[in-house]
A protein has these predicted regions:
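Flavin-dependent oxidoreductase catalytic core characteristic
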Residues: 1-180
């Protein structure tokens, strides 16, 4: 994460922020999908022989394969968190707490996906590991995405989540199962 990131006190509640910026979340998810396809195509090209995945080539490029798996876990996690919010909206079970969780996740994961996902103390997956040019992450530098990252990293978002948990209030999982 950029240490010069200025974190301001927020005045817009998370639910309102997300609803006002839904197109930003869609843009992020679409951009990450494009990056994912490029990374998968590259990995397939360097691990295939005679039209099939080669065990020896996969072993040779294990770090990249492992890195792509981590990247995909983050990308799909963001997509499904976004879908979770849509489900909660549709069933009118959404509160600011769930939106706070989502914007926090987008802020944290986007920074890691852009600058490096630490998979161990000595291994960091960066876009270059996946053969992704910086240009493909240009969406990250747009003012609306930078605002999302700042908003999600704000003390107010953290405080909403911490305060809720301290008071025994947890996010609605939206699983429609009364036993959970």
């Amino acid at each position: 994460m950029d240490s010069s990131l200025e974190i301001k006190t927020i005045t817009t509640l998370p639910k309102e922020y997300v609803n006002q910026n839904i197109s930003v979340f869609n843009k992020v998810l679409s951009s990450l999908e494009t990056i994912s396809e490029l990374a998968k195509d590259h990995l397939k090209s360097i691990t295939s022989k005679d039209g099939r995945i080669s065990n020896s080539l996969l072993e040779k490029h294990q770090f990249r394969a492992h890195g792509l798996a981590w990247f995909e876990t983050y990308r799909i996690g963001l997509r499904e968190t976004f879908n979770w919010i849509k489900l909660l909206q549709d069933t009118k079970n959404d509160t600011d707490l769930e939106y706070a969780v989502m914007v926090y996740a987008f802020s944290e994961y986007l920074n890691q996906m852009r600058y490096g996902i630490m998979i161990s103390q000595s291994e960091v997956i960066r876009p270059s590991t996946l053969n992704v040019d910086d240009e493909k992450f240009s969406f990250f530098n747009s003012p609306d995405v930078q605002e999302l990252i700042k908003y999600g990293a704000s003390d107010n978002i953290s405080q909403i989540m911490i305060s809720s948990m301290e008071n025994g209030i947890f996010p609605n999982l939206g699983l429609n199962d009364d036993t959970l």
